[in-house]
Amino acid sequence: MPHADQLITNIGRLVTGPQAPLRGQQLAQLTAIDQAVVAVQAGNIVALGSQAELSAWTADQTIDAGGYLAIPGFVDPHTHACYAGDRAHEFELRIKGASYSELMAAGGGIMSTVHATRAASKAELVAQTRPRLDQLLAHGTTTVEIKSGYGLDTATELTMLEAIAELAQTHPIGIVPTFMGAHAIPAEYRDNPEAFVDLVVDEMLPAVAAWWQQQTIWQEPLACDIFCENGAFSVAQSQRILVKAKALGFRLKLHVDEFEPLGGTPLAVELGAISVDHLVATPPEHIAILANSETVGVSLPGTPFGLGKSQFSPARSLIEANGILALATDCNPGTSPCESMPMAIAIACRYLRLTPAEALNAATVNSAFAIRQHERVGSLAVGMQADLALLNLPDERHIGYKFGTNPVAIVIKTGRVVRRNQLHADR
């Protein structure tokens, strides 16, 4: 008689995409099992199927899924969730007409958060970040990428990474860090941005690489991200930083084309970046280059939504070109203070014209591939981590259909219940 550590039973409907990456029309592929059971051993799935198929299994612990809809735990591949302070005052200024670039030029925007983060200790960063991770987890995210990038000096960037590392060891959510020392040009280098590029290349990257070598939590390369945009880093500056990062063993990621198409997408593909993120202003010829690569296009629909913009990334064009599309929240204090992947899906269905099936796969299977965690998380299959979100919804279409509420009832990480949302407890 087969035996497991845990059996997750009474799943009303289990839905998962194939394993990553999913290109083009593959993004709409889902497998559904009604009245499903999942068997878990040492945190990984060892069997899944219908209740009839797994009726012989026993376990040390049985988890009643309450008849809920089961999906893979969301994987959020792009956040800036570690920071101090907030930018609620800028939200009101934007409503009154201030632009993103105007706020940046006046010392606000990213610089406002840099000032607050530089003044915070590691303990304060941990304390302020933890509730954001609680919210991400409560909304069904079981793995999240978190960037540094609000230090813009070597010491604070390392403090941010240390805070992220502490959270990775003390919070149930899975965390994948990214170094983003090239997030913006700090005020002290405004008149000499090349000197800041020198600092990133000659001091920050080697220091962070040395720090990473001492870590025991993660076994894969650290990623280096950069904001390739007017007012931040040019294509030439980005290339210089990324070439050095690649030589030091970093994986590469880029913020590109949020406002203008500088050429960051072709650069990313040329250098073998794992993802390019934003893509709001990406022209068709660059979408074609991206689609013909292993680089994931990560759409952040909460960001133009948060900025009150009407232009969103051309996600359908990337799908139709047979590219790899993922979704993320871009959780950050300024433009997308969103901690909900279901909300990102709801926006994507409306403004990016994704079907609910496409959006679900983009937020699980392909988002795991965007941070190269796809061999462990993002889909439900034998050998994968038992990371599930149980939703109080009749089927997967309702994830994009409903918005403004949290449909997640129970969150399971490596076979353990790590969150029960009280709102759904009396169902």
Curated annotation (Swiss-Prot):
Enzyme class per UniProt: hydrolase
Keyword field: Cytoplasm, Histidine metabolism, Hydrolase, Iron, Metal-binding, Zinc
Annotated N-formimidoyl-L-glutamate binding sites: Y150, N332, G334
Pfam family, one: Amidohydro_1
Gene Ontology annotations of biological process type: L-histidine catabolic process to glutamate and formamide; L-histidine catabolic process to glutamate and formate
Cofactor list: Zn(2+); Fe(3+)
Catalysed transformations (reactions): 4-imidazolone-5-propanoate + H2O = N-formimidoyl-L-glutamate
Protein localization: Cytoplasm
Family, per entry: Belongs to the metallo-dependent hydrolases superfamily. HutI family.
Protein's name in the database: Imidazolonepropionase
Lineage of source species: Bacteria, Bacillati, Chloroflexota, Chloroflexia, Herpetosiphonales
Gene name of the record: hutI
